């Protein structure tokens, strides 16, 4: 009993001094953007709450639901909440098939809600609330085998006898559950193919980047051949981004058209009707490149960066990296011609060739890999909030890729975890997260009194703000890997420092000076604590010795 008690006392002391909590706010520095983070854990029935938390991880508001949450949430300027929840009434096989949008007031009362989902169609993934209160939303519709063949699809590429058409609907909410369709765009009005010359849409794919090749894609066996997963709108340009994950590209269409013009190739500010006015990521889809020309790999959350951020007007992309096993968050400047209200294209692949900014793990690019879900947001101070969706890790980086704030969602399918639990052994997914500044008008007149943190049995105070000096040593020393059966690397430009290794009982096992490589192969499997000391400053890292 005495030995167990000592372990918990040591662990608690080590944790509180050296920030070894596993859940909630893991890092909180004075360089982070002051605000509130909105997110919905993507769990089954264990927890159906959308949370608004401060930088300390304390809840300032939450909204419950009777439906499982999807995690596409927006806090409106009036303090109300739009969110997507799962009420799929269709038989479409689409991961991310949500079906329902809810609009709630600050106190959780329903203002309006719509399930737009039936046997052969469904709202899915993403939507945008416009300034006039209308909603743009992604909708998938079933197309039959015959309809697919009539549009030139190669039957050899159809393992199932249907395809899904991606559409964008603009609806006007009416009453508490009604709507009017205001505008509509359907992707199958803009197809081309070079497989069947008996069809009306037969043509040279490479000569028509404004059209979508019905035989392009990387998942020919699936009905969900586009798998659109993000929608973004620029009110300044009156344009819409659609991210097509399975094509490894995103496209931009003109929203200034009428519905009739959106079905054709003329009209609108661009003069191109509903045709594609810009595309980026994979020129293979329009026969203008090969695999080496690909820029995007199963991307998510492609968005116009809004006014108020340093890179406003540019485009941010969460480039998941499926197929290359590392993830990047990138910002690009598309070749937009403001005079002609269109994008410059002179043949070949659409530019740009290079990105303006990107984040990837600064120590080892393969340390950061989120193969699905996920998103990012540029904040007004230039920092970027990143949501690593598969593991529910939210972290904020500055323009130099230093992590200045991080938060691990404690909500798993099994329930709310306790601090000290290993989230890697649970499913703690989050699709996206957004951060709102303290001065956001949606907070005017609202009670933002901090409540408890979400995690059970917290061992740390997430409001213990790291000073710039304390953060300096965090940034100046990189330790990797933290799970190993042999070597630990210490990367730093510091000349003098002490390295100490402790077991879970607080026993000092090793002490050395200014080394950059430790061999722990002789130690038993289990958990250890590595402490690095420089001029009175301390960095601590939890190490797992594997078999």
Predicted region positions:
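Generic extreme N-terminus detector
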Residues: 4-5, 423-426, 513
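C-terminal outer-membrane/trafficking sorting elements
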Residues: 15, 54-55, 469-547
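Positively charged n-region of N-terminal signal peptides that target proteins for export
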Residues: 1-4, 545
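Sec-dependent N-terminal signal peptides
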Residues: 4-14
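Histidine-/acidic-rich catalytic cores in large beta-rich domains
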Residues: 20-466
